[in-house]
Amino acid sequence: MKRVILSLMAMVVAASMMAQVRPQNNHTVSTTLGAGLEYGFEWAFAGQASVVARVGMVSKDFILRSGWDNFQWSATMSPGVTLEPRYYLLMNWRDRRGKYTEGNSAEFFGVPTTMTFGKDGIGELAVSPVLGVRRAFARHWFHEFSAGADLLCMPEFVATPRVCYRIGYLF
């Protein structure tokens, strides 16, 4: 009987160690540093991959100016739609080490494609390959930081650096 119990315990431990953690489907309401408010849905599929779709008011430009005697900032928003394929890089590694992976807390590589619409009706299409870190906390909250390049494809091609900090609510 002792051998049976020990072998069952060994099988349970081995199964839990070999378990694959997958990203989770979730709905979010989030804002970026500066301006914007978006509703998003993350659909998990195929192992560590997911697709994030967001719609809402998107932060288009966030400009900081600083001088000897003043500090100014400006931000503009416009309606927009974002579709972002994501690949979570270290989710299994984090799970094997007992780290928190709830709410898709892991490092990721993503390619957000954003279409924004200005007041003159002319749209802008931006494709932005980014590396990021997402962490969930307090069960329903998350924050993520990503950096990469903004490749503005429409109306003309322009490449600029991209840094984004997002905080939001998971439900």
Q: What name fits each language-model region?
A:
Residues 1-25, 167, 171:
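Bacterial Sec-dependent N-terminal signal peptides
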Residues 19-70, 112, 117-122:
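Short glycine/proline- and aromatic-enriched beta-strand/turn motifs that initiate or cap beta-hairpins
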Residues 20-25, 48, 90-107, 137-142:
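Short loop/turn motifs that connect adjacent beta-strands in outer-membrane beta-barrel proteins
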Residues 23-37, 47, 75-81, 107, ...:
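Residues that define the transmembrane beta-barrel architecture of outer-membrane proteins
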Residues 39, 83, 129-131, 147, ...:
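Membrane-embedded beta-strands of outer-membrane beta-barrel proteins
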Residues 43-47, 89-91, 117-119, 135-141, ...:
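Outer-membrane beta-barrel strand-turn architecture
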Residues 64-69, 98, 122-123, 155-161:
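Outer-membrane beta-barrel translocator domains and adjoining extracellular loop/strand segments
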Residues 79-95, 159-171:
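Outer-membrane beta-barrel "beta-signal"
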